[in-house]
Amino acid sequence: MNAKKRKGSAVERNIVGKLRDKGFAVVRAPASGSKRKDPIPDIIALKSGVIILIEMKSRKDKEGKIYVRREQAEGIMEFARKSGGTLFLGVKKPGVLKFIPFDKLRRTETGNYVADSEIEGLDLEDLVRLVEAKVSKTLDNFL
């Protein structure tokens, strides 16, 4: 495994560990470089019936754009549709880790997807709060 893939794998493992610590059931399912024919997101996290799907991308520089190839994007969007999960692009740049809802990505003329630096994302704590808000039950749920 080359250094770039090792670093990306380390980021994914770190996120998996943090989500587990927050009570999620988590699977790391990296497919890049493998012989898998069916595209799947890098991280699948579940908590009380809520499914979060994360495709991770990293950059060495803070300002560069993050691209997802059309074929990969279509495959993981189909996985999200079939699973009922919410798909995020996890972006790791120097000093930055954010999770962008996939539907906020911009589509290029060639059909690829791109995350500009200006696109707002959630940090890990905000992502956890989003899920916990979906699973929290109030008295109104039982009336």
UniProtKB/Swiss-Prot annotation:
Catalytic residues, chain numbering: 32
Amino acids binding Mg(2+): 12, 42, 55
GO biological-process terms attached to the record: DNA recombination; DNA repair
Signal peptide residues on this chain, from the entry's feature table: none
Cross-referenced Pfam families: Hjc
Site residues, Transition state stabilizer: 57
Cofactor: Mg(2+)
Domain of life: Archaea
Cofactor remark from the record: Binds 1 Mg(2+) ion per subunit.
GO molecular function: crossover junction DNA endonuclease activity; DNA binding; magnesium ion binding
The protein's Enzyme Commission number: 3.1.21.10
Recorded catalytic activity of this chain's protein: Endonucleolytic cleavage at a junction such as a reciprocal single-stranded crossover between two homologous DNA duplexes (Holliday junction)
Gene disruption phenotype: Not essential, it can be disrupted.
Family annotation (Gene3D superfamilies): 3.40.1350.10
Alphabetized PANTHER family for the sequence: HOLLIDAY JUNCTION RESOLVASE HJC
Protein's job: A structure-specific endonuclease that resolves Holliday junction (HJ) intermediates during genetic recombination. Cleaves 4-way DNA junctions introducing paired nicks in opposing strands, leaving a 5'-terminal phosphate and a 3'-terminal hydroxyl group that are subsequently ligated to produce recombinant products. Hjc, Hjm (Hel308) and PINA coordinate HJ migration and cleavage of replication forks in a coordinated way.
Family, similarity comment: Belongs to the Holliday junction resolvase Hjc family.
Subunit text: Homodimer.
NCBIfam families the record matches: Hol_resolv_Hjc
Name of the protein in its database record: Crossover junction endodeoxyribonuclease Hjc
Organism: Saccharolobus islandicus (strain REY15A) (Sulfolobus islandicus)
